[in-house]
Amino acid sequence: DAAISALENFIATPTNKIIARDYLYLGLAKMKKANNLETKVVDAVVFDAGVAQLKKAVEMEITMTNDLSEIGKKFYEQKLFKEAAVIYEIAVTNVNSKNYLLDNFYLGNSLYFKNTRKDVVKADPIELQKADVAFGNVITAAPSTQDAYIFRARTNNLLENDEMIIKYYQQYIDVVTAKGEEEMAKPAVKTKFIESYNAIGAAYANTDKVKAKEYFGKTLALDPLNDYATQSLKLLK
């Protein structure tokens, strides 16, 4: 509180020459105060006040975005995805930031995980579209980032966009396949391939039963006892 008061008094004094970093430090101090590590509850009023200061810092000097990744990551690691997304959304306004790629990835993930919490009744399509754009920015900057494809596909699954579900899950498969057998043999990757084949099969089910059966067949080639693929094939007959 002492640091916040001192900074607020300094900024409020008309004769002082204020620089962007003054607003940045005030914003970061408010973020720290808002984030109660013991209760894991964020004080929304203090947090929003901190966000306002961070925005002032970035408006004055765009390179201040370079300092936002770390604070965004702290909220992200605490699974405070709403707050993390707000910070990363400011961070990615600087396309020349050294953290631009990672900031977009964490922005997309924050919005995705915020909308997949157990207490979410209905996912927010506007937030999911923002996540889709963020993952797209990662893919444009680093086309071999395979996790960006899988999360973009999952995001479009929540949006129930069959065309994009097929497109991005297939792109995930293609990018990983291009990396070779060693990558494809990893257990986590095999699980994601099964997820991809099942999702593509489900997306095709209403429009192209032949394609749907093909992809469910690919699932069973990897996991012969996969219940979802087995039941789906029965329904498609």
What is the meaning of each model-derived region?
Residues 218-224:
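Short, exposed beta-strand-loop hairpins at the edges of beta-sheets
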Residues 1-207, 211, 228-237:
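Alpha-solenoid helical repeat scaffolds
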